[in-house]
Amino acid sequence: MSRYQPRIILNHPEKVVPDDIMEQFFLTIKTGDIDKIRNFVAQNKNKFNIIEKSSKPGGPNKTPIHAVLELDDRIADQETKLTIIKYLDKMGAPMDLPDSDNVWPIHLAAADQDEDIIDYMLKNKVSIDRKDSSNNTPLHYAVYGKQVPCFDKVKVGSIVPPQDIDKLPLNKTLTDTKDYIVELLNNNPQIKNNLIHTVNTIMNIPSMYQATKTEKDLETDIVDIFTEIASNPSYPSQNYANSMSVQQNKLDQLINRMYILINDDLLRGLTNPLKISPNNTGWGPVTPSSSGQPSSIDRILEREHDYVFNELNNKYSSARNTVIDINLASTNKLSRETIPNIMRNINTNYIDRLIFCPDCSNSEYGEKITLTKMLYLLVWSNYKLNYIPDLVRRIMDNMKIMSTPIHSQIVNSNYTAFPLNSNLLVDDDSSLIGYIFSNLLRNKLNPQSQIDLALANVMDQVDPTINAITGGINSCITNQLVPLFTNSDDPNGAVNLFDGVLNSPINNLWSIPEFRSLREDINDLRPAYRDGKISWFQMLFNLIQEIQPNLVTGNTNDVTNNIFIRGRRTPRYILPLTPLPNSTNYGPPPGPPHGTLNNAYTYSEAFRVMDALVQYITSGQINATRYPRVFDQNINDWIPFIDNEFQSDALLQQYPELTFLYKILAVHTQRAIYSVIFNCISILLRNLPVSPEADIVRNYLELIDDAYMYYLLLPSEPNPAEFTQTGTDDTLADLKQHKWDPDNDLVNWFTKYIQRIPTEFIEQLYQLIIQNIDDFNYGNLENIRNHIESSMGDLSNFITPIINNSEFRNSIKKYFGTFNYPASYNGTRIASMQVIPRFNSLIDDIDFEYRFDDYLTLLRNGAITGLTFLTEVYGYFFVDTKKRLQLIDESLVDINAIVADIIANINNETYYYIPQVILPALVKQLITVITNIYAIKDVLSKFTPVKVEFDSLITNSIPEHNQIINLGNDFVSYVQDQLKIIYTNTIDIIKYHNNVIEFLNTHSASQLINATNTATGNNITTTRVFNRNLIPIQIFPSTLSDNPNFTEIETVLRSYSIPEITYYADATDNTDILIDIFDIGSTLNLYHGTISFDRTGIISNSPNVTDNLQINIENDGTVKDIPDPIAGQWLSFDVNHPRGTSYFNAFIAYITRNFQFDKLNGMPSSVFKFLPEYLSFMKQQIIEQVVQFIVDNKDTNAKKIYDELTNLGTQTSYQAIPDVKNYIIIGKLTDDILNKLFEFAIRQSVSSWIYNITSNDPRYRSIIDPLNQTISIINKKDYLRLSLNQINRETISDLLSTNSPYVDYGLAQVETNPNNLSYTNYQNLNKFIYYLYNINYSSDNFQDGNCYYINPTIVSKLIDSYTLEAKNSDGNTPLHLAISMTNPDIVEILLKHGANPFTFRNIRNESPYDLFNDIIRSHLKYDTGNTVSKSIENFYKPFNDLLVSRLLDDKFKNNIIKNITYGIPIELIMYNHMFHLYLENYRYDFTIEMRDSIRRIFQKYFNITDTVYPTDLFEINRDEDLSKILESEFPQNRVKTSVQLLNPKLRDYQKQLAELNNQIINLTKEKRSTINSQQISFINNLIANLEARKSIVQTNISDLEFKQPTSTVDSAMISSFKSSVNSIQNRIGDRSLNLIDFYRLAFGRIGYSQDLYLNIWRLYLEKDILNARSMIFPLLDQVINNHVSLVKENKMTRENKMTRENKQELAVIVDFYSTVKKYIESKKSLPNNLDDNPILQEEHDHIVYLINLILTPTIRNILISQIYQGLAESDLTNTLIADRNVAIRDILNSEYNGHSLDSFIKDILPNLSVKYFTTIYGNQDPNKFITSASDVFQPIIETVKLNRIIQVSDDSILIQNLRDYVIPFFINTYQNFIHHIELSIYAYEKYILNTYQLTKILQIMSNLQIPK
């Protein structure tokens, strides 16, 4: 339904303004000058509400606001526009009128993207619902954005233009000068000595690599090369060459590789020319006129020769500071922050949550188990607290106070004291009085517990009298009850009831708990008796008065039984003075006054009164000696008996007061009996003897304390020994002392709460506790745990409601300290014990035992609950992991101490013990840390499969089960992540170790150089120096592997070794520091507790003969010289027992004397660290000496040379200062000579190195020539590995006839048919997809294409319910537009505001969702392909087509370099490889988490396992493919399609063969002429050796002679290639290599043929994309495509199948592309130079690599071919020389500006051409001043002109052809090649950026709920 949009006119336009004024007004507005606008209005007084008119119909009709908003930003910026708008608005200009296209100012403001202008309009109530003529709302405009110029950085040029550089013509003078310099080097003693010293130092280089990885790798390579030869039994033979062809190639590569390595590693820049020029900043010769100092212009070198010492001092200080100023963050932070934080997190988030769940509102995880344990403990605590009361209760439940026989005895004794003798009926079965206590415990209790019997046994120990009543403990109860139940006149002291509560007001009784149950009975009394203020005695007296128990027999009082009548007069029915007949107080006077009360009354007397009254009421009779019936009841049954007695008799019911009084008496008596029994037991317990029986009682009755609680709460199973410590060793003493006695708040609370617990449950728990009387011993607490765990399942019906009770749970939490009291809390408060902190502390201090198997068995058998199992098992798992982390922490603390020792030794200048003792200990401790890390990882990894064992036994429906399992899963993930961090930081310790080695080697080098520099002769002495280099340890595996990688560590430690090294100590070395570090003075045993000084390897005789310690110090501190070094491995390491690592063989000798060496023998190997600087210093010193010598010594030859140099040249630049020119030439020539000499020395050094290795290995003796010290294969070096394509046969024939080494230049180097060019659509050009250039990016960091600025804030402000869903004339909503702009931010904003991506459709019936699907699917199809080539062909083909079309130029006769179309596809592959490498090496904000996530995605979708470097480039599985690419390595294979190539060595070999034949013939003659057997034997050996050499030469000749080959690549060649590929994969461990370094290193291991390289690239292009794991972008796009297919929305089907895992994968991919986006955008945000923009530098390096791969070989051959043909066409050349190759060789060897033609084409030209054609240079690059492309290539012409054989002038045909045709062709080729490489990179990056934006939108869409 359409919405009517009325036009609202707020300000009517002015109608009467003159046209000219109106036109001028709008013109003034369009100036953007607010002052002019104001002045115009002031002058013309015009109105503001006018409309701009046009002479044409339907003019614009724009308001002034329109005019302002349409101003170009260059005329008025946004601030100016706003100022003008505000002014116009203030003056009345209409702000809400449309123009003729219905465009409103709000539309223009939205398009202008200025937030302030939008805010101003909205503030002025401008409607945002306006539509233009195409129905676009302002929101449409805002989403579309503002097109802006794409960003391009301003380039700053040089103010001063570049100056011309003079060029010196070279001629014979230079040759003479060079010869003179050579003579000077040979004859001048000082210069010669320095030169010999320098050369011999170079020759010592192999010794500098002794025992290093480099040497070991070299040995391995040699073994690989020679294995086949040495194992060949037929060697030497005629087939020798065939069997060695592969090895020959490998050895060639090896020699070259070692040469390159040494140059890069040790001799950086040594053989590079020095920058020698006038007005330099360094050294210059001293002349007679310079007054001892060179003038500024005479300074020809960049630096003074002694600059090196400042440089070395700085380097030394840097190395030292790196060690002593080390930031110990890697270890300190680990031990003080990282690991403690991890352990705290484990405590808080896992252990505490599992056990206590302190923050849970309800019981979760394992808290119910904790609450259950606390319940059991509290019940048992209650049992222990109440055992004595309970025992008393049971005694009173089972015993009468006295039996009838006992009562009779009392009566018969006239109620006097009991006779304590055998006459008493002992152990009367029914009487408490008179029963032996121990027998009572054994025989009378029901129920009876083990503790009762234990107590009985102890009683018998204390009082063995069990057959009579005595004074012992067994008679205690009888003895203490006697005073209660005897005559009040008892001389033993009867108890007097008058002294107790019975003689106080009855109301006082109610405060006593035992009486409270009788309180309500007072209401049943008759009113006269309800006065609670009278005493029990008074109420009894009153009752007797009422009853008047007058016992009369006939008319006579029954004196014997009537105890109530006193005297014989008027009866007074009173409380009798005594109930006992015949008492002295009974009868006639002189007794007490009639009617008074006696002051003594016993329990026995009271009961007899009560019984007498009952008798009287019921029968009217009294038997004064009758056994009271209540005594016939068990003591605790008295109250029920009395109730029953009175309730069953109507007569008694008349006197409820009697019942009431009787019950009070009964209760009072029960209390007295209870007190007696309790007191007797207490007496026993206070006096327990020392005996096992007594200990059992103690254990049982000892109160529970906090130690019990912690034992049970700790995960199973704490080591019981930890709880049985005593004295000062007892760390739990405070817990044991905190008893659960009545003063404990929790216990006190529970004594009340227990009354709410079912008695049945309590009784069952009591039965558990009494099953084994020894369970409560601290050493047996595990039994208590077992009781709890095994019973809680059966008792769950009782337990569950208790622990779910909030009062119970909160009370426990209060005790734990986890209850948060509300501010207004009025409930019970329980003192907090802060249980959790102490609990966590105990975890650290206590050992635990592994009980998983036991628990699993119990779970299977149903003996424990699943929750118990999970809580205990996971609790142990968490705790065990934490304790293992604690071990790591402790080890890191030791490492910190070791590092401190290193620093202390360095500061003390005590160097010997650092590598000898401390560094191996550091490595050992590192191994300990790694072992512990792997131990944790092993625990984590094993726990997952363990879960399978119990998974089926756990009920998933119980929430706590799932909570604990999920908590465990999270724990595993968390700890694994933390272990990676710990491991990574730990491995940094190796870097520190190697920094220390670096410093020690630097120190030795510094000592040597300083000594050499200060020495006056050739005998050099120094001290405190190692005579050889210490070897750093290889880096351990950089990432934490899934399995313990101890084998790799073992490999590292095997190489952790030294050669034989001696330390030369200073006799004044201060060794005081050693006393503290090594604890000297006590027995030398362990260093820092980490490693024993005992060695397990070769006997060191340290510190004394036959001793084998690693330390040369005796216990008294004496340092011993140990003269014999031991080479070998530092540490003995056992994979199965890594913690047992010990010192092994390596031992550095210690000698207290100076180190001496002869300077002429070169520097010792320990100069290694400063070798580059030192050799550069020596080189400059020699140059200085040569120049200075010639300046100072003008002998005849020198003067002649000097004069010739002075006259050399025709330019005038230096005519006024000819001496400077001479200095420069002499310096440059000397530099050139030294460079060549040093290069020769380096190669000789490498050859000697290889010879020494092979000569010392018996396996290679048969291929060694000991006379000439050469190796056969080295002598067989063949450099003619040439590639033949089409051939200029005439030229080739000419070349072959002269044995030219330059055959390749005769081959056709251009593609004669462009249709043959690969990777192009030249004959079928498809339309290029231009949207690559037109993607609408919000970023301003792009140079080309259309760039748009979109302000999300403005978009948000222009959204309302109408604009959000408004359609324009195309039916597109703002969301359609945002998607078409591929702007994820705007898409997200619109969706958050409620935009519907499914409902609204445009005129093409597309919803926004449809549109997005179409866009992303079309986009992803662009790089879809099943091969590498197919995945990128949509990029390289269009650009190759452009390249070819631009190269096909008539000016260059349509010549196109062969293989030039390989450049772009290879660059696109390299781009993929580059980001693969960035991801693997975490560059440009890539992280290990992102890398691991991408790896998991590739593993899931493609089953790809990534490697760090793109080694998939070299993985060729099919031998057929391998054979094809290897054919280029064999000249004979190329001969099949060309002509035979002859090696220039053929004639040399023929000469050698002739010489060998001559030697053999003459030696044979000599042998015939001698009879000396020894001489004959010697000659035979020589002949045999010569024959072997002859065989080799014949083989060489045979190889070089033309044959039609019968085979190409054999299996050995294929095997060799595969071996090389394996070598790449296995040996490239240096993570610092960039992509180009990797290619150079990897290709270098395979071969040196450019054809081979191209074939490898070609085969990779045809590789299945799934086998090209480094093609990261196409592979990721396949994954994205898969995810797109999971989210569908069309007319027929709507579904979203994307899982949570898919969404996580998509998030990873978006994050990856976001990081790539930042990289691409940063290219332009960084400075536009190679020094400050590493991205541009890498792009530069890529293009240089491609130039050298594709252009350089061909360009070189074209150039040489042109030179050759030019010489061939010259009659003068044919006349002067017979062999044109001599001229070519001379041209190639000629140097211009220090570079030969070859070095310029390969090393200079690629870099220079890329810089020039991209206009990107370094900051100080002088090449930036080159003004024409011809200047870039000019050195080629200049080099050709410099040859000494043929004078080539600028007018010669050769030079003209080069200048006019060849060089322009080169320029065109290089320029277009470079430009289109850059263009392809740019396009590919645009595609990647669009991929990011579309993928981000996909991520947003994936989270939408698609409506059904």
Curated annotation (Swiss-Prot):
InterPro entries linked to this entry: Ankyrin_rpt, Ankyrin_rpt-contain_sf
SMART domains: ANK
Keywords annotated in UniProt: ANK repeat, Coiled coil, Repeat, Virion
The species this protein was found in: Acanthamoeba polyphaga mimivirus
Pfam family, one: Ank
Coiled-coil stretches: 1539-1603
Domain of life: Viruses
Subcellular location: Virion
GO CC annotation: virion component
ANK repeats: 20-50, 60-97, 101-130, 134-167, 1370-1399
UniProt-recorded name of the protein: Putative ankyrin repeat protein L484
Repeat listed as a keyword: yes
